[in-house]
Structure formats: C-alpha cells, structure tokens
C-alpha cells in the first residue's frame, strides 16, 4: 500500500550536535578553542622555528597572549568531557592559576628579550632579560609538575604540552644567547643540558599519557569508539603534534632553521547519524568493527588523487545514498595505487568519479536518518546513510549529489583564521574508509574520512638553506623485511621497522637547487645493537658507517631511544634524485627503527678552510693587540660589519667552534666601536623619535634595513624641488661629550650620492659637497642567489669589493670628505664650556632636485689632542668667535628692546590675550618686521636648527602669532584674503583669483555683470568696521556693498580717475599689509589652513605655527642667505601704486548681512575684505 509509506528525513544536526556534550548532567559547549590554538602553534613550529624575538612574539600571539582563565579552562574541559572525568577542584584551580602566572611572566620576558634584542650591548637590557629568563625558568620548573598530578594526567595533558613547549623555547634562548647575555660558559652548558633532558622527559610524558588515556576508555560500543576517536584526534592535535617538534629545540643540532613535517593520519567522526539518548547502538557497528574497518593499518605516506563513489538505494521511497567507493592515490615518487572497493559497488546511478588535482581541505556532508514505514505487515525500517558531499579544493568544488551541513572544519579548523580557509586550512583529505551494518529492520552505512596535516607536502623537497626533515614513511618502496609501524607518539607519524641486511627503502627527492649543492646527511634511528648504514642519493653516497645501539633488546621505544646517525661524508645533488638507505652487517636480523632522514646544506672543504683563514686574519686585524683591548683607529664601523659578514658565512658544519670564537671577537669589536662613537642612535632606529636627542630630519628621509652594501640600517636622502626647503638630517654632539683642545672625526660610508652637503659646525662651519657614483648591486650578474628566500640579501654569495682605502687630504693632518665611498671630515674643539653648550652640529643636506644620498655606519669619534699649529689655529678661531658673539649680544639687546615694545603695544595687558582697540593689521605687520630683525635666531646652514637668539625670537614671534589669531577672530569674513581661492564666496558670472608678488592672492573682477558675495553671521546691535584694500583699473567704479535683507545698506567705492578719500595712514596700511602678508606666506591661521580649521583654539594653532617657523625662520648673520627674501624677512615687494584701503562703520539690525563685490566697468582687483567687530 504505497500511500501508507512514510518517508521522513531527520537531519544529522538535529540528532547529534557535535558542539555540545552532556557531562554529569551539565551541557557544555566544547568549541575548538584549544584545537585552534594548538593548530596555530604547530603552524609557527613548522614555518618559523627560528630562535629570536620573532618566534617568541609568535608564541605569545598564538598561545600565551590570547589565553586567559576561560580558554585555559576550555583546554581542560575539552578532554574532561571526552573521558567523562572531572579534575578535582584544587587541581583545576592550581593549574589555571599557574598557567595564568606563566603567561604573565612570559609576556614580561618577551618584552625584556625584545628590548635586549634592540640594544644588545646595553648592560641594563642584558641584566633585565637574564632576570626575566631566570624567573620564568624557575616558575616553569616549579609549575610543570602541577600539570601532571597523579590521577589527572590525561585531562591536564594539553596544558602540560603548552607549558613544556614554552620551557623548551626559553631554554633554547639561553643556550643560544646566554653568552651574549653575560652568562658564564658553565651556566650556558648547564642550561643546554637541561634542555636536552627536558626534551626527552616532556616528549615521553606526552606519549605515555596519551596512550594511557586511550587505554583507559571503554571499548565495546559504537559510542565508545566515537569517544575514543575524538580523544585520539584531539590529543594528537593539542599534544602529540607539538611534542613532535620538541627535538628541534636542540640548537646545537639545529643551529639554523629546520623544516619538519607531520605525516600522522587523523579521522573525523563517521558520517553516521546517531542520537545516543533516543536510539539503540544495536543498529550500529561495534567498537572493534569500527576500529578495524575505519582505521587504516600503518602504511607509507600517500596522496589522494581520485575518489569514485557508487550510489545505492533503498526501494521504499527510492532513497539514494553513498553505497561504496574506490580510492586512487600515489606514494611520493611512485605510481598510482588503487584501493579495494569500500562498501558495495552499487550501480543504481552511474558512478561519480572525482579527480581533485589539489588538496581537499573541506567536506560538507549530508548524513541522514530516515525512519521508513514499509508496507504492512513489514516492520518499520531505519536507514542511515550519506546522501551527498561537497569536496572543496583551493581552486574548485566537487559535489556528489548535494551539499550538506556537516562541515569538516568544525573538527579540523584552519591553522590561520586571518585568511580564507582555502588558504589557511590545516589538513587535507588523505583517504576514505567505509563502515556498515545491516540487519532487521535497519541498514547503517557511512564513509569515514582520514586527514593528514598540510605540512606533509606531496613532494620531498630539499631546500639548500634550511635543515630538511623528511619522514621515511614518505618513501615509495620498502623491501621485504621492512614495514611501517605505529609511531611511539612523539615522532609526528608512523615509522619504519626493518630487519634486513641490505637495501631498506627507496624514496624520491627534489632538490630545489639547480646546481650541485653539498649536503650532510643524518638519519634518526633506534637500534638495540650496532648498525652499519649508508645513504645513496643519485650517484653520491655517504659510504657505510657504523652507529652504536641506543636501547636494550625488546625495550620500549622512548624519546631517549632515538639518536642520529650522522655521516661524516656528505652527498652532492641537485634537481630530482632517487635515494635509498641500506643496512649491512645485520647477520642476526636484528630489528631497527628508522624515523626520518635529514639533509643539512654544507660547502666544500677547500672553500671552508679558505674562508676560515680569511676570517681569522680579518678579525685579528681589527685590534691593536692580541688581547683585543682596543680597536685600531683606522678600523671603521663599516669595516667591522664586513668582517662580521665573513664570520657569519663560515660553515657551522665545518668550523662551528672557530666560528663561535670569531663571532665573539667581532661582537666585542662592534661594542668597542659603539663605545667610542659619540653619535646617538648610531643604527638609525628612528628619526625625530625623541625631541631632545638622536637624529632629526626632514620627513622625506627613509630608514631602510640592511642590504648588499650595509649590514645595519642606513638612510636615504632624496632631492628637493626648492633649495630653501632642503632635505636634511642632523644631530648635535653635546658639549659634555667633548674634550678641550681635541680633534674629532666624522666618518661613515656612502653607497652613492649627488650634491650631498656635509657640515660640521662649532665656531664656524666646515663644509664639503660629496658626489659618490654608485656601482649598482655588489653581486655580479652571474650570481643567482644574491637574494635569500625571504628577500634578504645573501651576503655569503660572491660579490664585488670596493676599494676601502680611498681617501684624500685637505691639509696636513686633517681629513675631508671626497668622492670615495668612505668619507671622513674632522673638526677641532677649543675650550669646552658646559654652560654655553656649544657642542658640534653634524648636518647632512641636499638642496637640489637631482641630489640624493644613501649613507650609513656613521661615526663621530675622538681623533687626537691638538698640538702646535692646529692648537694655535683653534685658539684664534675661538677668540674670533667670542668677539663676534659679544658684538651680537650688544646688537641683539637694542633690537630686542625695540621689537618687544612694538609687540607689547599691540595688546592691552601683559597676558597678551586681548588686542588694543585700535590695533590693525598694519601695526601687527610692522611689529613682526621688527621681530625679524633679530639676528642668529637659526643657523644659516640649516634654518631648522635654533641659533643663539632662538629663545627671544620665538618668544616674540609667538606673541605676534597670538596677535594674528586675535585679529582673525575679530574678522567675520571667511577667506577674505582669497588665499583659498573662492572658498566661502558665492559667484555670479566670471571672476578669477590670481597670485601676484610672492604668492599673494587677489580677486580679479573683469566684467561688470560679475558679482562675488558672502553671507555673514553678525551680532545685532554691535558695531563693525568694513575695511577693503583694492585697486581699480580703467573706467567705472568698483563697489563693495554691505547690506541686510531689507534696507540698511552701505558701500565703499573705488575709482581710478578720482582721488578717493582714504583712511588715515592709508599708504602705510597698504604697503605694510602687502609686504607682511608676503612675508608670512601662510604662517598664521587664516592663510595656512582651510576654514574648517581656521577658528580652532589657539593651542592647536600654536603647534602648527611652531613647525612652520622651525622650518622657515633664518636670520643668522654668519653669511648671506638668499632664502631670507623668499621667506619675506629681507626685501619685500610693496603693492603696486593705486591700491588703497577704505573702511566704514556698520551697525547691523539683524543677525545676518551680505557683503557683495562688483563693478560698473573695467577691472576691479581686490586684495582683501575685512569685517571687524568693534571693541565694546
């Protein structure tokens, strides 16, 4: 009876919500926070396993900087809910409290480390980082045992792994940087020994506890297997994956970056719909069936290529579902492997075959439960199956029947959530197994997906600049007697077991270097007896080498069981090569375990010996004696950096001890160089970073990191379009650092320059213009590896050398800058006076459009005491300077008094907050002109540097600016000087705004029908003065009218043919007004800002004003400076004849008036319009 059939579909997520699990009657949302954090950490360990601040910051960002009490609790709950076991309250509280404390102390340690890394020679930073290390190290030694409290080891295991990883990271820091921190050799070695001991201890605990946690779970029902698999998966992600990288913290075994891979397989939940609260497990496979059918036996690593799905159906209601499938994969370097049929090769629909051509990083599945009512008298039938899946690769999606809602990313989230999942995914689909159970009246079927970590690449790529770790399960062939077995838990995947006496395995390698490169080879192994092994790559072999036993016969595999078989003879290879491992002398057929093979790039012996000898000679030549107490005076900072490059390029494999010794000597030389250098911020950390010290410069200067010429930061100075506003860089050497009657030297290195001016200024200016032609890159065209993999310069590649000895002499015993890359300029210092604090100004300047410069390694250091002629010469220069200073002080007193009186007359009181009622713009300009008669307010060589009279000049100039601001506040006309074009003005017809005489803007009304107007808000009943400065050309009249809506109209008329009545002192008003407007060129508010900012508070305006005058003021009288006239402080151009100023009084009756500008004939030119509020 067809109409009695009921076909009901219950969605997967309605029956079982994987995000919520009941534990002791409490519903807990699990989420994936701990898994997210662990995946991000693994990404860091895979991609950036390099000691230093970058790694520590990553560790802080990914783990310790984002977790707090709640996330740490989530780590614990994640496991608690799976094993159905609560941690005792005291243990939980202690663990979370300890984790918080460790996180806080790690944050402080990272701050101290970064501070030391930025200033490694500072004893304060060294002391701080050592103190923070010892505190954090002590806390970790104390607290890690609290994460393995007896009885709660399993739920605490994920936080144990995080704390252990942190401890190994800082122990590695102390082993690498301890000597530079000031730790003794004994202390450094002790820390290294603890590091090695803890690597084994922590790895063993993680693996043992993992296995114990799984063994303690029940293993009977389907639901037992679900819990078992989830715990296995979660502990793999949060514990074992991290523990797999513990051995890489051995910095002496991994002195450079290493790249590891995780080949383990993990399984997402079966795509079977089941609700344990409502349904019986009798219709589902048992634990043993699930484990044997869903989990693959250990095997060589393979890559999924194709998946063919067969569709089955249940006749009642024609319900189609995934009935079976076949997988085609390949081993790396091997051919395709076709799996047996999983499930049934059904044919209810044509098979669907998917060739992915890329990693499948996501599945969206549609598992369903359909309770079907069969025709009477048949019993109801429960059908569980998968009705559709969408497979996603980074480029495409492949859909079998339909897309579902069960997302694999909920169980295996991305490792990087800052990018789309197609880029930040953590796992890729590796295989699909199948489980089913049928009976009366039910059928349960569903695929189970297995996944591998993305770090396990689909090729065995060997890079020439890192230590390459290749798991041996990535071989493509094993000989008889060799097999893959389960890994012990801390290896990141399965391992190889063999008892052969001969060839063990074959694998395919891809060397990224296209020319022959030499590599050292080592194999991680465990053996109960001596083993003789060899590795062959292409036509190159290591030869047979004997290696000792590592464990007792039949002993358990622990972290201590594994050691490295390091071959003294390396191999040479490039491109694609086959590789094999062989074992000989295994007559007794003892069992050996092999984990991974590692390739370490090395150079030839001859080159290594030559480089070592060359580096030793260069280092010894830096010092005055063999005890390295002092540097030779002619050893420059740049030369020390080049010697440092020589040492850094020595082979770690060939001469590691010698390299370390030479490196310490070079570092000592660098510290001595820094100590004698009187410049602040010698490494260009910032420009304008600190107001009272360091480098100051124009904003167009850039600081760039080291390149093929400079090891450290250097600066680039571009050209300028206006020589009055040059590109500049300067610093003052404080008087307290100088010695009396001593010669000092400025020197450095110029990569290239054009029109670079260098000044040393004390009593007078020592000045040189330096043009140094650049030679382009130091790398010859034949060198292919001049750039490293991250874009950094490869300073170890062969390169061209410039002559470091070029120099020239200006006078016997003196030095000057010239056209060589090394420049030197000296200056003599007479008697020092801390009160005067004259110091020495170091200036670099470019004032041409084609000018440019790149320079670094700057030094200012003591050269020698002055004697004889040089001493007499500096004394004469000092006396001449003091005579000039006395004359200047006498002149300044007179000029200052006049200027101050003129400025004070503008205001009503000494608070300078209110103008006199009769103060007009002409009076302000006249006072300003007197202020600018003060000489030596700024240095003529660079007008941003304050001179001897800067204080009094800025004092008066600040009051002048206040006067301008107060005057502007009385003028209610916006943009009355037309410096902002026609902004705020209404326009009818055609008018122009033109620039005349030093960028002064005027309004030109050329046509009688044109009109310009502005609506102005006023205060009814108050008095206003309308003042207009204008010029009329030709016949007719120019008119400026002010009126209200109705009546109350007044106007000012301008004519060219009739002598107009002018305001008193009209000529002075016109000329001074124009001249001083040109002088300021935008220095005060209404000329320097749009009107959105013109009426802000004086405090914000003053800040802008200070920078303007720091840039522009230049009245030093040391030499003629033609930029003075351009800035308005020398000769100025008055208004042409005919400009007049008129004004009238106006009393509005409403709050709104209109000011209109027009003419009757000819051309009307308006310089400014002012509407001033009368004083009450």
UniProtKB/Swiss-Prot annotation:
InterPro entries the record matches: Cry1Ac-like_dom-VII (IPR048645), Cry_V (IPR041587), Galactose-bd-like_sf (IPR008979), Pest_crys (IPR038979), Pest_crys_Cry1Aa_dom-IV (IPR054544), Pest_crys_dom-III (IPR005638), Pest_crys_dom_I (IPR005639), Pest_crys_N_sf (IPR036716)
Name of the molecule in the record: Pesticidal crystal protein Cry1Cb
Gene Ontology biological-process annotations: sporulation resulting in formation of a cellular spore; symbiont-mediated killing of host cell
Signal peptide positions on this chain: none
Keywords for the protein's UniProt record, in alphabetical order: Sporulation, Toxin, Virulence
Organism encoding this protein: Bacillus thuringiensis subsp. galleriae
Other facts noted in the record for this chain: Toxic segment of the protein is located in the N-terminus.
UniProt superkingdom: Bacteria
High-level lineage: Bacteria, Bacillati, Bacillota, Bacilli, Bacillales
